[in-house]
Design a protein with these regions (language model features):
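Mid-length scaffold segments of soluble, non-membrane domains
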Residues: 47, 60-64, 69-80, 183-230
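Forkhead-associated
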Residues: 9, 35, 40-108
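Conserved, compact domain cores that house catalytic/ligand-binding motifs in diverse enzymes
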Residues: 145-210
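Extended, aromatic/histidine-rich regions of cofactor-dependent oxidoreductases associated
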Residues: 148, 225, 237, 246-248, ...
C-alpha cells in the first residue's frame, strides 16, 4: 500500500511539473496557443503584412503594412524582408536579415523569423506521398494565450499497466491521417500488448520521422474521448522494452496533442485499431470540457 501511495505522489509531482511546463509550451509567448494562422504556400511569392492586399494579412494594430515575402520555387523557400522592416532569426538576433533561405521544421536547424510580436516558421508536411509547404505565424500578444491550468484525472495505479512489446517483422508503415486531412506514412515498428481487468488489448506503436529516441510512442482513443478527454486522440510515451520485450504503459501520463489547444496544429491521429473500448480515466483532461455536476456518478470525474 505504501508503494501505491509513493507512486501516486510521484505521478502527482510529475503532473504538477508537466502542468507548468505544458502551460509554458502551449500558453507561453511562443506557445501553441499563440498561433494565429497556418497558411499553405503555392509556388511563387506570398506576401505578409497588415495591408489586406497581402496574401497573409496580420493584425493592423501590431504589424507593419508590409512585413516581407516568401518565395517558394522548386520545393525551396526563401524570405525577403520589406524595406525598413526589422526581421531577426534565432541564429542572428543581433542583426536584422534582408533575405534568407528558409529551413523547415523537418531539418536539423529550422529557420525561425521574429519581427515585433510575430514569430514565423516554415513547415513541410507529407500528404499522400507528396510534400506541402506552409507558414506558421505566432503572435506573442494573442488573447488566446490566456487559459486556465491543465487538469487531470486522479492518479490511479490501475492505469500503470505491464505490457509486452512485439516488433513487426520487416519494415512496415501506416497511413496516418492528420487533423487537417493530410495523409502521412509513418513507421510502425511494433505493437504493445497488455491486459486490463482480464481483457487483452493492443496498441500500434508509431515512429515519427523526426523522432530519434528509443522511447515508444502511441496515439490512442477510448470511451472518455466523448467528454472527459480530448475527442480526437491522446498521446503517451512508453519506456524502451527490456531484452524480453517487457515495458510499462502509464496512462496516468497520457497527454493531449497540440491540436487540443489550437486549430493551426497539424497533429496526427491514431491509426485504425488504436481505439480502446473502455473508459481510460487517467491522464490529461480535455481542456475544453466543463464538468457537469449531474454527470454519471459511476465514472471517475477529474478534479
Amino acid at each position: 500500500r505504501s508503494h501505491e501511495w509513493e507512486y501516486v505522489g510521484t505521478v502527482n509531482e510529475l503532473a504538477v511539473a508537466r502542468s507548468r511546463n505544458t502551460h509554458a509550451v502551449y500558453y507561453g509567448p511562443n506557445g501553441w496557443a499563440s498561433l494565429v494562422g497556418l497558411w499553405w504556400l503555392k509556388s511563387g511569392v506570398t506576401t505578409i503584412g497588415a495591408d489586406l492586399e497581402n496574401t497573409i494579412a496580420l493584425p493592423k494594430d501590431r504589424a507593419p503594412k508590409n512585413l516581407g515575402s516568401v518565395l517558394l520555387f522548386n520545393d525551396s523557400a526563401s524570405f525577403t524582408a520589406a524595406a525598413g522592416v526589422k526581421v531577426y532569426t534565432d541564429t542572428a538576433m543581433q542583426e536584422p536579415v534582408d533575405q534568407i533561405k528558409l529551413h523547415s521544421d523537418l531539418e536539423p536547424k529550422a529557420t525561425v523569423l521574429r519581427s515585433g510580436p510575430f514569430v514565423i516558421s516554415y513547415i513541410v508536411r507529407e500528404d499522400r506521398r507528396q510534400f506541402k509547404h506552409a507558414l506558421r505565424i505566432k503572435d506573442t500578444l494573442s488573447a488566446a494565450r490566456m487559459a486556465p491550468p491543465l487538469r487531470y484525472f486522479p492518479v490511479d495505479i490501475k492505469w500503470r499497466v505491464q505490457a509486452r512489446y512485439v516488433p513487426v517483422a520487416g519494415a512496415d508503415s501506416l497511413p496516418i491521417i492528420g487533423v487537417l486531412g493530410t495523409e502521412t506514412h509513418m513507421a510502425h515498428p511494433g505493437d504493445l500488448r497488455f491486459t486490463i481487468d482480464g481483457k487483452k488489448y493492443s496498441l500500434m506503436v508509431i515512429r515519427e520521422p523526426e523522432d530519434h529516441t528509443n522511447d515508444l510512442f502511441v496515439m490512442f482513443t477510448d470511451s472518455t474521448n466523448r467528454k472527459e478527454s480530448y475527442p480526437a486522440t491522446r498521446y503517451a510515451w512508453v519506456s524502451p522494452p527490456d531484452s524480453l520485450g517487457r515495458t510499462v504503459i502509464d496512462f496516468n501520463k497520457a497527454f493531449n496533442p497540440p491540436c487540443a489547444f489550437t486549430k493551426f496544429a497539424t497533429c496526427p491521429f491514431p491509426p485504425k485499431g488504436n481505439h480502446l473500448p473502455l473508459y481510460v480515466t487517467a491522464g490529461e483532461w480535455n481542456p475544453h470540457y466543463e464538468a457537469d455536476a449531474k454527470q454519471d456518478a459511476t465514472r471517475t470525474t477529474p478534479k
